[in-house]
Swiss-Prot record:
Keywords: Cytoplasm, Cytoskeleton, Immunity, Innate immunity, Metal-binding, Nucleus, Oxidoreductase, Selenocysteine, Zinc
Record Gene3D superfamilies: Peptide methionine sulfoxide reductase
Positions of Zn(2+) binding: 23, 26, 69, 72
Pfam families linked to this entry: SelR
Protein name: Methionine-R-sulfoxide reductase B1-A
Gene from which the chain derives: msrb1
InterPro entries: Met_Sox_Rdtase_MsrB_dom, MsrB_Met_sulfoxide_reductase, Mss4-like_sf
Organism from which the protein derives: Danio rerio
């Protein structure tokens, strides 16, 4: 059985508000909206994680890794090395169901 499946309902695919994407299970910080970009795959795509330990990786084949939450192990999707929007950047394809979005709160001056 493939780690990657598509059942539709990728609510974050075309979602580009400012904020942060966290693990849907434990709330650990995974991706910033600044690293999100449009891609032809059916899943939300990111170029980098927030923290070095945001995800754990298991090599699936050369240049492709299964990624899980670095804190709780929740299955997130895949990283494709050097397949991002610019040379040298990765493409993280992540299941919307594995993410929770936290909008950026504008600071109010008092």
């Amino acid at each position: 059985m493939s780690f990657c499946s598509f059942s539709g309902g990728e609510i974050y695919k075309d979602h580009f508000e400012s904020g942060m994407y966290v693990c849907a299970q434990c709330g650990y910080e995974l991706f910033s909206s600044r690293s999100k970009y449009e891609h032809s795959s059916p899943w939300p795509a990111f170029t980098e994680t927030i923290h070095e330990d945001s995800v754990s990786k298991q090599e699936e084949r050369w240049g492709a890794y299964k990624v899980r939450c670095g804190k709780c192990g929740n299955g997130l999707g895949h990283e494709f090395v050097n397949d991002g929007p610019k040379h040298g950047l990765s493409r993280f394809u992540i299941f919307s169901s594995s993410l929770k979005f936290i909008p950026k709160v504008k600071n109010e001056q008092q």
